[in-house]
Amino acid sequence: LAPVVLNKSIPELVKAAKENGVAVLAIINSHHMAAMWPETEKIAEEGLVAFACTSYKPAVAPAGAIKPLFGTNPISFAWPRKNNTPVVYDMATASMAMGEVQVAKREGHKVPLGTGLTKDGKDTTDPAEIADGGVLLPFGGYKGSGIAMMVELLAGALVGDNFSYETAAKDNNDGGPPSGGEFILAISPDKLS
């Protein structure tokens, strides 16, 4: 139900940031958020700087490990520009989004070395070995691991939701999506400068 929550709460977040300079929105116990750029872009179109992140069930091994601990933990950032579209980016903190790995698997394409490991912890370019029991790796090695951990802390601990590994433990495997948290920050450049 993330879209319903976002549609109702983003206008309140924007209002609070414009009044106070900074505002945070915490979403808990929500299903997959999909791409986050639409919400950060919407906030930036209101003249605010926006940052959003979410954690999800584990699919990424920290640098040097072979077991998943982090979600793909996407982040999105948007910067407002007067009389122009905002600067926006949205990316996974994993080397590749799991959706891209699944597309490569379905279409029979290889993925770059460094994308993930087999279930035995071996490097692979075969997306099936990653998607079917293997793990993704963070982008940028230990630096990406640090950013993924930041997302776990912001979108899990800070908002009062689960870490990715806890989300997997609580998933009842009924075919429905597990739930997680999202952290959204809005900053008013006008109030702060």
Predicted segment positions?
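A glycine-rich, acidic short-motif signal
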Residues: 1-87
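Phosphate/diphosphate-binding glycine-rich loops and adjacent basic-rich segments that engage nucleotide
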Residues: 60-128
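Catalytic-core signal marking the mid-to-C-terminal active-site face
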Residues: 165-193
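Short glycine-rich or small-residue beta-strand-to-loop segments that form or flank ligand, phosphate
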Residues: 23-28, 138, 184-189
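Secondary-shell segments that build the walls of catalytic and ion/ligand-binding clefts
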Residues: 106-165, 170
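Metal- and O2-centered redox machinery and metal/ROS homeostasis
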Residues: 3, 11, 38-39, 135, ...
